[in-house]
C-alpha cells in the first residue's frame, strides 16, 4: 500500500513538477544546448577559414589559386605564407561575420555557374578584382596590415626605390592596395579601359 502511494506521488511529481525544478531544468538544458550550438558554430566557422575549403571548388583551385602559387605570398625566402583567408577574411569577429554573409552571394554564383569556365572567369576578372580592391581600399587594407605595417618598417633594410615609394605613400595617406594591385593574382586585361583609372597613377604592382 505504501509502495503504491509512493509510486503515485512520484508519478504526480513527474506529471506536474515543481516550478523550481522546471525552471532549473530548462536553464540547464538551455545552457547545455547553447554550449553545443556555440561549439558547433565556431567549429564550422573555423572550417570555412581553411585554405582547403577556399579551393574546394574548381573555380578557385584551377584559376586564381594557380596564379597565387607563383607569387611571393605563397613562397619566399622567409617561409612565411599568406593563405586565402589571411587576405580575404577579417580576423575581428563582427567583420568576419559580415564577410561570411557576403560569401553567401558567392555560393549562389557557384550554383549558377557564373565563372565555371576560364572564358567566363576572364570576362568577369576585372569586375571581381575591382570589387576586392574597393573593399580593401574601404578598410584601409586591413588584412594586409595583419602582416605589414608602415610603423614597423625598417626603411634602412629596403631598396632605395621601395624607401621612396613607401615614404611618399605614407606622406600621401595611401593604403597598400593603392600601389600593390596584382601582387597575389594576375591583373585583369586592361585593353579596353584606361589603366590609370583602374590601377591608379601610383600603382606599383
Residue ranges and their predicted role:
Residues 2-205:
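Short sequence/structural segments immediately N-terminal
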Amino acid at each position: 500500500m505504501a509502495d503504491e502511494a509512493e509510486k503515485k506521488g512520484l508519478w504526480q511529481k513527474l506529471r506536474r513538477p515543481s516550478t523550481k525544478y522546471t525552471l532549473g531544468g530548462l536553464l540547464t538544458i538551455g545552457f547545455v544546448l547553447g554550449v553545443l550550438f556555440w561549439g558547433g558554430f565556431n567549429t564550422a566557422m573555423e572550417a570555412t577559414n581553411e585554405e582547403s575549403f577556399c579551393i574546394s571548388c574548381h573555380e578557385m583551385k584551377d584559376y586564381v589559386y594557380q596564379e597565387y602559387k607563383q607569387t611571393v605570398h605563397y613562397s619566399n625566402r622567409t617561409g612565411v605564407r599568406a593563405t586565402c583567408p589571411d587576405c580575404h577574411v577579417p580576423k575581428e569577429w563582427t567583420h568576419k561575420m559580415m564577410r561570411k554573409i557576403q560569401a553567401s552571394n558567392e555560393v549562389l554564383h557557384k550554383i549558377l555557374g557564373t565563372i565555371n569556365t576560364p572564358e567566363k572567369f576572364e570576362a568577369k576578372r576585372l569586375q571581381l578584382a575591382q570589387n576586392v580592391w574597393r573593399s580593401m581600399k574601404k578598410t584601409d587594407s586591413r588584412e594586409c596590415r595583419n602582416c605589414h605595417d608602415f610603423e614597423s618598417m625598417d626603411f634602412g633594410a629596403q631598396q632605395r626605390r621601395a624607401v621612396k615609394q613607401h615614404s611618399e605613400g605614407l606622406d600621401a595617406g595611401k593604403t597598400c592596395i593603392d600601389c600593390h594591385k596584382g601582387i597575389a593574382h594576375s591583373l585583369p586585361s586592361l585593353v579596353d579601359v584606361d589603366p590609370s583609372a583602374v590601377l591608379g597613377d601610383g600603382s606599383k604592382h
